[in-house]
Amino acid sequence: AFAKKRGDKSYYVRGTFTARNLDFANDVFALADAGFEQISIEPVVLPSDSPYALTEDMLPTIFAEYDRLAAEYIKRRRDGRWFNFFHFMVDLDHGPCVKKRVKGCGAGGEYVAVTPVGDIYPCHQFVGRPGFRMGSVLNEEFDTAMQSRFEDNCLLTKPQCSSCWARFYCGGGCSANAQAFSGDIRVPYSMECQLEKKRLECALAIAAIEREAAAQ
C-alpha cells in the first residue's frame, strides 16, 4: 500500500543486517514478495565488541549470501518479478563525474551537520566526536582548516586506495567510518572496502548477464 501511494515518486525500503541475521538475502526476498520494488539492505557498522558487529571471520558467509542474492535477483528480474537492489546498481554507460569518482564522501566539504545547539560537524556521524567540531552557526565561527582537510580527503591522498581495482566506483568510502575504525579519515575501514568490492563484483556480473540476455 505504501509503495502504491508513492505512485511515480521514488522511494527505498531500507533494512540493516547484523551478525544476528547473516541470511539477509531472505529479508530482501521477503520485502520483494511484499510488493516493494526499491530495496536496500545495509551492513551494520558497530564496534567489534558489540554482539551485533560484523567481523572479518564472517566475510565468507556474507560473500556467499551476496552470491545467493545475486542469483535469485537475476532469476526474478528475468521472470517478471522485477525489483531493484540498491547495492547492485551500476551505470556502465554514464555514471558519476570525475570528481565523484575521485571523492565519494562529501562530509566536511560539500555538506556539514548542525546540532540543535548550533554546533557544526563534518556530518551527522561525527557529531560529538572530540576534535571534529568545526564551529557554530550562532557566532559565525567556522574552522576552514578542517574544511580543507576534508575537501582534500580523496583517492589521491589515500595510499591504500591507489592500487584498489574498485576505487573509482566507491571514491574512497566513508570518512566517518574510516576515522572510527582506523583513527584517520585517510585510512578506509577494511570491512567496508571488502563488502563494497564483493557487491560491485555481483553488480558487474548482473549487468553483463542482463545485457547479454537483452542482446539475444
Over which residues does each language-model region extend?
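Radical SAM enzyme [4Fe-4S]-AdoMet core and its adjacent flexible, acidic
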Residues: K4-Y111, T115, P130-R133
